[in-house]
Amino acid sequence: STLFPYTTLFRSRTGLIDQVDLVSSVSGGSITAAYFALKGKAMMEDFEAKFLSQDVEESLRTSVSPLNIVRLTSGGVNDSTGLQSWLDENLFKNATFGDVLRRRRPALWINASDIYNRTPFVFNQSTFGALCSDLSTFPLSEAVAASAAVPIVFAPVVIRNYGDRCQSAMPEWAERALGNSNSASILRANAEAIKRYREHTDVKYVKLLDGGLTDNLGLTGMLLARLGANAPYEPMSEREAVRMRRLLFIVVDAGRPPGGDWAKSVNTDASDLIQAVADTAVDANVRNTYDTFAAQLKSWNRELVDWRCKLPLEKARAMLDTNRTWNCKDLSFHVVKVTFEQMPDPGVRDKLERIPTRFKIEKENIDLLLDSAGAILRRNSAFQRFLAFDEKRGIN
């Protein structure tokens, strides 16, 4: 999940890497996303040497031992400091979200799971505003460690809730969601979580685990932004909404299909059963989240065209800063989902799907992913339609 997004971004040979405005990540993919948001294209110079070729698991507790079993009873075999310290020492060098914010593009949303409220937790300005905390001082390494904190392997990452010190009112979207019994369930659940943060009675500390528990594609942040929006153009600005012609979301899914031999016999090994239960929950969540996101995107496209066409032409032209002809209907949103199963070569596809999800990647698997991911994106039919749609006009 770490390498696939990286290779999809940089090996597609489409020039889109210069036009990325937002990266939303989950689990191991958050390492790639955070480093890209911090370094931009410069990450290509050293990411393979600094991370992909390293054995991160050397810094983690992975053996079965009495001491590790005791640690397991305390929440997880590894606390957050092992992975976080490795990331700071080798990759992020104590960088914070403030360092990313100063770069301005791309915006970075890292996704974890709030295991008390059973909701996604997005490391962005909106969430930290609700906690009355300062996102700009928060370490990238700690957010990444939370996003990738697989249960049992890692103890929860714990951050303090300052909600009782808030001087500002609850976010308007949260108040609206709580006051509307018909509000979307995902919006209402997150509004209730924010209410608990502010009340500070039950949640003095927010405890976070792997974002894949609640959203294994990292799409919830955008869904919440749209469902809680006050205007058709949000979370964009009016100017951005007027100037835009094309919006492309590339959803990278490094999930694997069902595998193993345990379904061939009557009996089921306990470890296989535990893994199957986890995979079932995650895969069902992935399907539902993606379908909801795709439907929301179509609806947003229609709403935004309608809003643009109702704007006074003088106001639109003032925001364009150009004399080019403007067509209010010239706006299209696209979503492209990239998966291993889209690899046409069955032999290569089988090898890709067998790559284990670990913090240690064998050299042959690195080479396989580097050769495959960009090619998968280029062959994707939805992506080809997007490129063909704009090949004579440029991408905006």
Model-derived regions, located:
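Stable alpha-helical elements in mature extracytoplasmic
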Residues: 1, 16-19, 28, 32, ...
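C-terminal helical/tail subdomains of lipid-metabolizing enzymes
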Residues: 9, 192-194, 198-226, 230-396
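Short, small-residue-biased leader/transition segments that mark boundaries at the very start
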Residues: 2-9
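Patatin-like phospholipase
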Residues: 10-77, 81, 124-132, 371
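Extracellular/periplasmic catalytic domains that process cell-envelope and extracellular macromolecules
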Residues: 16, 40, 79-80, 100-104, ...
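Solvent-exposed loop/turn segments at secondary-structure junctions
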Residues: 1, 28-31, 38-40, 114-118, ...
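Active-site gating loop/helix substructures
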Residues: 60-74, 85, 102-225
